[in-house]
């Protein structure tokens, strides 16, 4: 099936999945690789809200139970914002055992294509009360070009 017909060929998830499928090689076209499955689960398990303001873009991601050292925010090539990290399983204390374990553990990742007017030198990230807020400032709009007057000389 050609995913371009669905209109999802220009999304970060599509590009990530396409890259992983190419990297897997032609020997395993019919079976997804462990890396593909791991990364797809990591992206699906990390929902995010993205807001646009007049001067910035704001990414809000739920990160319950994580410390700032467990979260990594990076800008990759081609203006791609990468939010990743790992939720670690709580160590069992002696004499205690889990009856039920429902909280997610493992690696997580989200990639977002930033617009051309995103200022990748002005990014801040704050994690408070289990919510990560990444703010990307916008570049100022380019000033309109003023007409240049060229002096005409008499020959």
Curated annotation (Swiss-Prot):
GO terms for cellular component: cytoplasm. Keywords: Cytoplasm, Stress response. Gene3D superfamilies: 2.60.40.790. It comes from the Eukaryota. Residues 39-155 form the sHSP domain. Signal peptide: none annotated. It is found in: Cytoplasm. Belongs to the small heat shock protein (HSP20) family. This is 17.3 kDa class II heat shock protein. It comes from Solanum peruvianum.
């Amino acid at each position: 099936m050609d995913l371009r017909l669905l209109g999802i060929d220009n999304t970060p998830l599509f590009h990530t999945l396409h890259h992983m499928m190419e990297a897997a090689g032609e020997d395993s076209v019919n079976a997804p690789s462990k890396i593909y499955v791991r990364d797809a689960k990591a992206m699906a398990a990390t929902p995010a809200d993205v807001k646009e303001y007049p001067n910035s873009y704001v990414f809000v991601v739920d990160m319950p139970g994580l410390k700032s050292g467990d979260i990594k925010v990076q800008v990759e090539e081609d203006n791609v914002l990468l939010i990743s990290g790992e939720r670690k399983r709580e160590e069992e204390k002696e004499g205690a055992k889990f009856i039920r374990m429902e909280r997610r553990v493992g690696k997580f990742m989200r990639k977002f294509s930033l617009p051309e007017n995103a200022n990748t030198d002005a990014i801040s990230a704050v994690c408070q009360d289990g919510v990560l807020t990444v703010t990307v400032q916008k570049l100022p709009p380019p000033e309109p070009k003023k007409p240049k007057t060229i002096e005409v000389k008499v020959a």
